[in-house]
Amino acid sequence: GSRQVRLVGGPGRCAGRVEVSTSGTWSTVCQDRWDLQDAAVVCRELGCGTALEAAGSARFGPGTGALWSYVIDCAGTEESLWECPRSERRECERGA
């Protein structure tokens, strides 16, 4: 299936909680180690320009669906979140 990323729960399409879809099911991204480099890649991928902040702390709500239990570690130069290194986490805090 196609891999997608979106922002939900914010004031517009370029702000909100990060969710990813790997097989048609949307999942909330872990906020563990989520930073401005990760946010920069999502903003670039969505055509939203420069990332202003990496809110974290479930500012836009923790999400209610599935949890994508990977910690993402982008350099900030990637074109897509799917190009970023990631490591699986058994437990993580939802809501980047």
List PLM regions with ranges.
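Intrinsic disorder and flexible/low-complexity segments
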Residues: G1-A96
